[in-house]
Amino acid sequence: MKKNLLFVALLLAMSLSASAQYKGFSFGFKLGPNFDWVGSKTGAAINQGTKTGFDVGVVAEYYFAENYAIVTGVSVDFLKGQYNFEDMRNISAIDTITDYQLGTVGRQFKTTVYEIPLMLKMVTPQLGNLPLRAYAQVGGAFGYTQRVKVMDTFTLGDINDTDFRATKGEYNPFHASLRIGAGAEYTLLETTRVFAGLYFSHDFLNSISRGGLVSSNYEKYYGGDKELGEREFKLNVLQNRIGIEFGIFF
């Protein structure tokens, strides 16, 4: 994580120290679908397929050289995910009696993230006689998770209980990711361009909040018959996504 952050910071520092001969600002809008999945450094959280979300936002870019720009903005990202993990749950129907059993928890979640990207954009010269240019971007994004909806399904033999819903407090409110992308832009008028691109985003921060996973139904994280410690360290859920974006600059 530290090496990735250092790499991004170095790129941005180099770009800011470059010549300011080609200064210029552009503003615009973008939107598009994203395809989300989760990873886990420990392997304790097992991804259960790719989910489809959506991004929408405003973008701004500052050209500090003819073919180089700093890109930022604000986006609202609607993200989804699903993963399984083993854990103990109290399955007793009597309040005064506890009966913790090891089963499989299937977790589905939806989050709304307000995100500010900070990217270095590198653009090619015009391709042939067409007003078309290709670009690549690298940088990071930082945001805040405003809303989380989570549903857990606990499975143990014939038991399939979907009543328990995790709370927002179980998820980290802060969001930071590495992002790379590429695409093309087409000039319609002197100051108007449309663009389409593809990007990949990988989280730096564990999505599970420290200390947020203690509830009346779950104890500490379990694997097999051994207690492995606090769940936020063992699950270590990282959000990944590939997005397609379409937009316009004015």
Predicted regions and their residues:
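Extracellular loop and loop/strand-boundary signature of outer-membrane beta-barrel proteins
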Residues: 41-47, 101-107, 163-170, 228-234
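Short loop/turn motifs that connect adjacent beta-strands in outer-membrane beta-barrel proteins
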Residues: 20-25, 67, 125-133, 188-193
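Residues that define the transmembrane beta-barrel architecture of outer-membrane proteins
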Residues: 25, 50-54, 110-114, 132, ...
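Short glycine/proline- and aromatic-enriched beta-strand/turn motifs that initiate or cap beta-hairpins
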Residues: 20-59, 241, 247-250
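Residues on the lipid-exposed face of transmembrane beta-strands in outer-membrane beta-barrel proteins
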Residues: 29-33, 56-62, 74-76, 116-122, ...
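Glycine- and aromatic-enriched membrane insertion/assembly motifs of diderm outer-membrane
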Residues: 46-101, 114, 248
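Predominantly the C-terminal beta-signal and adjacent terminal strand-loop region
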Residues: 175, 180, 185-250
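Outer-membrane beta-barrel translocator domains and adjoining extracellular loop/strand segments
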Residues: 39-45, 82-89, 147-159, 208-215
